Amino acid sequence: MQAGKPFIPADLTPLFHAPIYRELKESERLRYNQLHALYFNEQIMYFETALGRPILTALLRQEWPDRLADGLRQFVAEELRHTEMFRQLNRRCAPHLYGERDYRFVEVPAFWTAAMRWAVNHPLSLPLFLWLMLLQEERSLYYSKAYLRHPSPLDPAFVEAHRLHLADEAKHVRWDEELLDALWLRAHPLLRRVNAKLFAWMLEEFFGAPKRAQLRVLDELARELPELRGRLPEMRRQVLALSRDEAYRKTLYSREIVPRTFARFDECPEFRTLSLCGYQPQSTGG
């Protein structure tokens, strides 16, 4: 690790988009950047552990063409490898935060953990999770590329981790699309409408604008840098206010970030009528 280098492109962090960021010292910005990057790694780990692998394991209980079944097994193995890579990276960077646990900022209540565990084991009835996988993995492609093209030096361990992540995610996006083609279009229209509404809610609640975990990042920043404690309430307020900032929301999801997912939304009437972060329907020209 190189303690003096940022871990993530600054524009991928929410506080960068808040006015108070310009008032922080360079050292304060740097430590915030590093803490947010650790949280971002946690988010990848949680998504792959709580959603990705269980969904794929459940799908492998179904009959698939040999080529796709082999792809799904490879998908599971690669998700395991990614999780371990980001776990070890966080532990090397911040042993005081991760010495005996994997998550410092991502905290999911027991009720939601149990509900999610049940839901992801029923991907045929709840194919919304395939949309979440496609959306998040296509977004990961964009983020990993941002690490590689960043003009100023980032910590090389983080750049290398995202280079390796990028190498697999392109395949994962293709497999996600194949699964959607196989399961979504054959589902009953009512099931698709219900799943689309659940998807919109989950996206806003867990994968949208800053909420609980990002506030814990700010809390840790103020704990490590006591001179920021007086500013903590205002930092929290401004970060939460980003949920109403449409320009910021488009930095999370847009046609530049997730073009294939949004193009598929355009083709599905059940998504075109929903309010989704960063999404505005376009004509498919059919």
Spell out what each predicted region is.
Residues 1-286:
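Non-heme di-metal
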